[in-house]
Amino acid sequence: MYEWNEMVQLMISWIEDNLASTPTLLNMSEDLGYSPYYCTKKFHALTGMTLRNYIWMRRISRAALELRDSNARILDIAVKYQFSSQEAFTRAFVKAFHMTPAAYRRAPRPIPLAIRAEVFSPYHYHLRERIVMSEVEVKAVEVKIERIPAHKFIGTWDIASKNYGDFWRNGHNCDEISGTLDSMSHLSLPGQLGQTAGWFYQDGQKGYLYGIMVAADYDGEIPTGMECRDIPESDYLVFFHPPFDYLRTNGQVMKMVEHKAWNFDPTELGFEWNEGTLYDYQRHYPEGYGYAVLRPVKTMEESSDDIGQGSSGVSIVGDNETTA
């Protein structure tokens, strides 16, 4: 029943808000109005983890990000996330990531951070609300031009997957891949959103990719099971919908944007598609950015001068700036 999905999602939000405090199961169950027994039982059923292990992994992962991004003392970070001592924190960190906090701070490397669990989706929301798609309010899809500089793409390519759902159903571990990429978020190509999905073409067949865009001169570690490929500079047509309510309108927004992207004629703007060696990218950050599909293009000789001046009423986005 979707009611339990929603309740467990509320539990997850409650945990996220209290990672740096000392709440108890009783505190949470009282706040949410369910018994401790049902909280633990339903949480495990929907996430595949015990509450205790989930909280432990989320705390150690949040602490890892603070080690990477702040100058706070290791002891202070340990205490903040409810470890009894720096030694206890070190033991936990080694157990989770096979290296000490001090070693990680000196040389951050890709590690499998535990990501926030999500069990209440737009599907469950619409079961609850019984909203028909015609009642959903969405905005017009914008078309913009953006130049992305040469970069590297680190991730996973799967020719057997056609979309996001296919990708995770085809044996890729969402928690492991997303958590590892999250640990590399500080390396994201400036102006990009971090974890990026998209499509590639191989022998006339379309596959799906998932990873992160990093600087062209990146020479650091490549996570096990992932590849690193060089991507040249290119202009992209960006089919964009501004921020929206993920639970309420995600399906309709994605459908509209993708319909526009896959059916658009770039010659109207003096372009042609350039997907032979480049990839289509997908940006999905509903509340903070919105949703966009980016398709690489190259200018046509006969209209290159006009395009360079930003004709045809299409917005020109500067080098490496997102369209948010």
Predicted regions and their residues:
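A solvent-exposed interaction/effector surface
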Residues: S61, E87, K95-M99, R109-A324
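Short, charge-enriched, intrinsically disordered boundary segments that mark the beginning
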Residues: M1-Q9
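Terminal helix-turn-helix DNA-binding modules in bacterial transcription factors
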Residues: Q9, S13-L26, A45-Y81, A107-R130
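Short coil turns linking two alpha-helices in DNA-binding domains
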Residues: G33-P36, S84-Q86
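A short, basic/aromatic helix-end/turn motif that makes direct DNA contacts
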Residues: K80-S84, V94
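The alpha-helix within a helix-turn-helix
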Residues: S29, A78, T90
